[in-house]
From Swiss-Prot:
It comes from Bacillus anthracis. CDD domains: PLDc_CLS_1 (cd09110), PLDc_CLS_2 (cd09112). GO terms for biological process: cardiolipin biosynthetic process. Its EC number is 2.7.8.-. This is Cardiolipin synthase 2. Keywords: Cell membrane, Lipid biosynthesis, Lipid metabolism, Membrane, Phospholipid biosynthesis, Phospholipid metabolism, Repeat, Transferase, Transmembrane, Transmembrane helix.
Amino acid sequence: MKNTLKLIFFVLLLFALFVSLRMFIDVAFYSDVIGIKDVSILGIISILFTVSAFLIGCVIFLENRHPSKTLTWLIVLGIFPVFGFFAYLLFGQNFRRKRMFQKKALLDEQAFLQYKGHEDYEERILRNHKHQELLFRLADRLGALNISFQTETRTLTNGDETFQAILDGLKRAKHHIHMEYYIVRDDKLGTEIKDILIQKSKEGVVVRFLYDAVGSFKLSKSYIEELNDAGVEMIPFFPVRFPILNDKINYRNHRKIVIIDGNEGFVGGLNIGDEYLGKDKYFGFWRDTHLYLRGEAVQSLQLIFLQDWFYMTGEAVLAPEYLQAKAVEGEHWGGVQLVAGGPDNKWETIKHLYFAMIASARKSIWIATPYFIPDDDILSALKVAALAGIDVRLLMPSKPDKRTVFYASRSYFPELLDAGVKIYEYEKGFLHSKVVIVDSDLASIGTANMDMRSFHLNFEVNAFLYDTDSIRKLVQDFKDDLEESSEIHVDRFHKRRLHRRIVESTYRLLSPLL
């Protein structure tokens, strides 16, 4: 044991000295540019970076991260010491995460248990969804909220249909409106929503609005002030004033939630902005998917919002008036389950449910996602499913909005294609849907991408659907999207140019950090 510790200490010290040497060379080389000519100052900088690199190396090692993440951070720090040092301070530090989110996790668990029904769904599940029993049990143990069989769901295709439904719903509000968004724009759509919220607030409707401080950093102060002055409570999620000193910058609220009077809700991939209506010159047509809910399951969506609200404001509003969603009677609705994922989860809830969905497949697995940075578990599950003869299809955009993620995603294509996965690139515009469909009777719609950031860092929310009418529309939409896509063929893809392979491999190396 002592020899092992000595070896670890020696390796970390060598790593720190290497980073320091790189730093010394870089600073010396650019000394004229940055105005440092005194050798003693260079020496002090070098010593400081030696100590910092050693301490960071120790922290990375002791955090017991996944080996790929540990190795990636050490490589980045070694090759790009200055960039790596500040990148780690911004995005890499993980040692306060447990303490930061421990209280929220406990409060969420208590609230979810308090409002989790005691109905025994087991007989109904076993009768209608025997092969998905494992998925139901897993969701229950991971802390997911109730499965509702008395909720109407409707798939909303693209921005026009989605925002027309949302605007109509906001106008119907009589008691309260709760909204939670990653990106809010001060443009035509944003202004239209703002005007409705102001009018509703004047009518006495309670309006609460959470927006992510980083995702909506371009949102004007006048937009926020106008809403606040009208009585709308507009609250930022994790505001960031000094990014380098604020480790919250890496944990963002990626959720998109609208709740109207506690009985109607919306969740999915669309943020608030004109580009989501296809009005961006670069992207053009914007392909996205949202879900409308009416009935019992809206209570689960409400709980997720109210717990986020309490986390940011300290205002506890778990009152019965907000949690009285009415069941929609009928035997044909199918099952709906809302699942919250985030850095406050002990288990990576959404990732594990994706994995269980893939593992439960008997005929088909269809995935639409704008970003594909899977971890080893998801990647292996998809390859094994394809090798077993299951129809595995992956639909992605043909043009990037984030080049690093785009090329890193493509680095996974060769091994997937070799295993028999069919990969398509959507060419009509930009594909932003976050959809998983298994065997045409099990699906997920939500905010979580098929990437490590959604699995580990972002606050997300997904609706898992079991044999609902909305799944049938999802299946048809997916088929329609394939008509607007081109299939990537394995032979042709393996012949792509060398510089593309190098770019993809380079970004693949950084994929644990993306």
